[in-house]
């Protein structure tokens, strides 16, 4: 069984150059579920509705991962709700409430999910090896650092904090052989479950632009009588590109 690593045990790599580039940058994250979208904003002359987005808030210090979101630094984060069911229903209101948060510092991207469930006994969770938890309930973060819909890295956690990570291509094909060192924690309770992640910037490659525009997707998967995917915003099933939604 893989045990989630405490954040303090993550081995830091030589990321001096990366951190110098990141210190004065603002990460803009488009927060949705299951399929990546472009993190863009409508200009004054645009007539299209801008896609949902959320500023990435920088913090001082490191978050202690407990799976309970009890570190005071989380109070600085802005929540987003995954309001739509995109599978099996097509853009219908989500039947369960899910909130997500994101923060960052010079070393890590932090994510948290609060997954409410009206029937907590239906939550599926197993203690398993890495990458063997995708049959459970899980939350997943997909990150496309170049915002070009070609490739994204995915980081998933089940209600026991068991990790899964892989590479997703724009076509939807996945490579589960991808394994990196990052931290996670999760807990179950009477109202559902909560998960936290700390992903070091050292696992990513990205361009040298002063302003970074990344696509960051947040997903909740719920296997019940069917597998339910909950999303914020709607998903276009006519778009063949998984990352180019």
Q: How should these model regions be labeled?
A:
Residues 42-245:
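Structural preference for beta-rich elements and adjacent junctions enriched in aromatics
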Residues 29-39:
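Bacterial N-terminal signal peptides
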Residues 17-30:
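Bacterial N-terminal signal peptides that target proteins for export
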Residues 1-5, 27, 206:
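Short intrinsically disordered, low-complexity coil segments enriched in acidic
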Residues 1-18:
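N-terminal amphipathic/basic-hydrophobic helices that include classical n-h-c signal peptides
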